[in-house]
């Protein structure tokens, strides 16, 4: 098929400015799980692809070129900056232009790979063909062997999605909003079924490919890094309980690698969108990520963390601490005898430290100094554990007492950023940071009051 996308008169740098800026609200990009090495013939490898592919507030260079194929779109989603009715500068890359940019940035060590999304130009199938053509050129003509993550466009022809899957490391289909009702109200052109269909196709393709790789060692990989999705949080009235249940269902039914949560930012000014006087709900986004981690790695279920009577996460305590203080009948846990499943539910004990505890206690009984060396955060764990039947200090196993002590340090909103999780570092601006961000400013940013 001929790809009738003209370069036009717009300079490439202007296109890059427009289309990197337009891509900054899509957070569903990561390269974890891909370990393809260089083959000596191609350019790039994915050995170092587990690093954080995001943008920092201190001016550090991003390692993933995150751009849109085009910000033209036939849809008119109320929350989207690139909606059809929005008056913004428009631009479209050709596949060759994206390949050129990717290779030039890679050779200069600016990036580790490519994250390519797109508005819908013409129709979904044509847009997916452009994405597929771009990646095919990168892999075959330019011999690029680095990490590539692209979008699967809902409504695109299944055979084009299939072809794309054999060329990329990860694919994602954005769920957009947690429920079908929210999607109908803010994105009337989109339908839940058309979003879930490519998710199911990718899941099936990965499973079939996994079996093929058992039989044929050199079989080509299909979406080797798995698939992910993204939900916008705060644009519609769903509770945290609804959102985390949707995420759990996606993990169970579609074998997703990641669900990303994006705090809603009103970039269109549409009057039907909620007003956010305190700014984007960044603390809520943070709590959802913490709960998501508990679902994926700690053996928790959504119904254990929240229910219809308690539909929102605690502002002051992280989800694991909140669960623990509500289930004090299960504590204290004896470190030297508790199974791994119980250790993982103790605040201050992570996956790695729980594994180290299980391994270390085979050689003898563990003490509190041993736990500190292992990596346990004792200032949180001490209320919930004993070593050889003794607690670290004589503390009360009472909910009010523990909550008071856990929330004493107000700077425990653990972002590690200034709250601007939705902002992308410009590839061109010379940003000057006149002073470091203070602890108070971090707290204000976390709760949307900065």
Language-model regions, residue ranges each:
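Canonical Radical SAM [4Fe-4S] cluster-binding loop centered on the CxxxCxxC motif
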Residues: 67-96
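Conserved AdoMet/S-adenosylmethionine-binding subsite of the radical SAM
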Residues: 99, 122-305
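Long, highly charged, low-complexity intrinsically disordered interaction regions
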Residues: 272-344, 380-429
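Conserved, mostly hydrophobic/aromatic
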Residues: 64, 77, 116, 173, ...
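Flexible, acidic/Gly-rich N-terminal and inter-domain linker regions that tether
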Residues: 1-72, 377, 385, 393-450
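Short, charged beta->alpha transition segments
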Residues: 65-67, 96-107, 214-215
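Short Fe-S-cluster ligation motifs
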Residues: 103-119, 291
